[in-house]
Amino acid sequence: MLISDRDIRAEIDSQRIVLEPFEPAMVQPSSVDVRIDKFFRLFDNHKYAHIDPAQEQPELTRLVEVEQDEAFILHPGEFVLGSTYETVTLPDDIAARLEGKSSLGRLGLLTHSTAGFIDPGFSGHVTLELSNMATLPIKLWPGMKIGQLCFFRLSSSAEFPYGQGEYGNRYQGQRGPTASRSHLNFHRTRI
């Protein structure tokens, strides 16, 4: 069940949900707004002939830090990784979903391509998969609102929350935009 602003505040007050830093004004009727950090991962397209999720490709991306009072320019058709300014910590019985801000979506900005779900037990910065679908560059200002987290109460606590090892925890405790670690649990059924 999607939880309301009242329940979100109660979960934050009891420190079952932790957003750091937290600003009470960011709470919306059924979500909490989150901001974008100053770190981005750019794809170095000339390092590899193709992207292979089965292989570690450590030079596929490079980390860029935006200077204070500067914006990151996301060009049309470009895809980069960013992250939330806030760290997010969830209890074992609450999951979250990152959604974009409609005002930014109307400008052509996508905040995630597929990975908007955050498992119960997760702790860290949420990596954003940013795409510019517009025909003009978009300025991304560190600290601006970039999305919103919606929280869902599970029917019971997860038996193996994220970070407990049973299902993997490749991104637990991540700081900033984290490159793909798909090679660590790559699975392919031969068909």
Swiss-Prot record:
UniProt biased composition (Polar residues): 171-183
Biological or metabolic pathway of the protein: Pyrimidine metabolism; dUMP biosynthesis; dUMP from dCTP: step 1/1
Annotated dCTP binding sites: 101-106, 119, 127-129, 148, 162, 174
Any Gene Ontology biological process: dUMP biosynthetic process
An annotated Gene Ontology molecular function: dCTP deaminase activity
EC number: 3.5.4.30
Site (Important for bifunctional activity): 116-117
UniProt keyword list: Hydrolase, Nucleotide metabolism, Nucleotide-binding
Database matches in InterPro entries: dCTP_deaminase, dUTPase-like_sf, dUTPase_trimeric
Enzymatic reactions: dCTP + 2 H2O = dUMP + NH4(+) + diphosphate
Family statement drawn from the similarity comment of this UniProt entry: Belongs to the dCTP deaminase family.
Subunit-level organization: Homotrimer.
Record's function text: Bifunctional enzyme that catalyzes both the deamination of dCTP to dUTP and the hydrolysis of dUTP to dUMP without releasing the toxic dUTP intermediate.
Name of the featured protein: dCTP deaminase, dUMP-forming
Native source organism of the sequence: Pseudarthrobacter chlorophenolicus (strain ATCC 700700 / DSM 12829 / CIP 107037 / JCM 12360 / KCTC 9906 / NCIMB 13794 / A6) (Arthrobacter chlorophenolicus)
Gene for this chain: dcd
